[in-house]
Amino acid sequence: VGIAQANFEWIGAIPAMVLAALVFIPLYWRAGVYSIPEYLGLRYAPSVRVVAALITSVFSIFATGVALWAIALTLETYTGLPIPFGIVVMGAVVGIYSISGGLRAIAFTDAVQVAIMFLAGLVVVWIGLRETGGLADFAAALERANPTHLQAFLPADHPDFPWPGVLLGLAVVLSPAYWCGSQSILQRTLGARTAWDASAAMMFAAFGKTLVPLLIIFPGLLALVLAAELRYPDMALPWVVKHLLPPGLSGLMFIALIAALQSTIDSAINSTALMIVRDIRGVLGRRTVPDGTRDLVLGRRISIAILLGAMAFAPFVGHFGGIYQLIQTLLSLFQGPLFALLLMGALTRSATPRAGLVALVTGVVLSAALLGFGINMLYVAFLSFCYALVVIAGVSRLTPPLPATALDRLTYRRGSAVTDQAAPGPAK
């Protein structure tokens, strides 16, 4: 895909992260929730909470499997270890520290991992440009190899990332749905000391995203220029690390690669276990007061089950093409309707509980049908989002809303500034 992949960071991350910091994170803190499905349950109905948690949990299991496969592929490229062996070993390693340590361990390890990734990535860029004769020679070689890789926006008939789909499906739907409504992302902000800390962290992360495309896309372009023969496109980065960098730096970057993928896994395991315990079992079991010790034990057992399910799925990931496209396709199944619920629930007081449930369930069914007919994932996300908006508006006119008093802390109000008060957010 080339430089066009950067749209998933610049267009597909930074604006949505700012939106999350200014609107949705303060809203979640004021609502006093621990998870995104919990907010949807308060804003709409407990049934919406269960369905949203179930859909998100299933996706997280698949996403964890994708990350495990990517780690195993990196190990095979760098060390020659078989992919099945890498899946089992890394699944056990990540499971031990994420299950035993919880969110605090995840936050600490992620902070270290990010530092390693950025430092090692900058070194890859510097050495890569030096080896190819500088930026001008690198661009010329890339132009000869594949001119489309220098295009920021691909043609409208591109099978994977057409420019209208990027602007509509990515910028309008998939990006804000992920950064404003993903439990694995927002669990860190919901676990911060104060609402101000949570929003400030998201804004700081948005600034860091400006450099991410350079660190992610450049190694793939470098592998193309150097005429690397790769079995999978996802082998580009570990190939560059192994064949271009000197031993010490190569090992550092290898650790950074593993760390980045581990971050995806530990976040998914922790957030999914939380949703299953609180948002699915808690609602279906009609529990009003959480049982801390019992929930902790259950959460660890569920985490093990999630990891085993992901390990079972991981060997099949290679049959679906690139991992990035696979993840976006899975997200397009449900993020259109889910973001419609979040947007209408946060910005309006008219969306009703019945409307939210109908829009979410039928919207996911519509997305699956559209993907089944071969429609591009980006268009699927946008069409299902628009459909869900229409359903919410229509059904809300026919069904009763929540009491006005219940909506005061569940809808966005202008002037509700982010403060350093810890009280509005969930108990820490």
Model-derived regions: residue spans:
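Membrane-embedded helix-loop-helix hairpins and adjacent transmembrane boundary segments
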Residues: 1-428
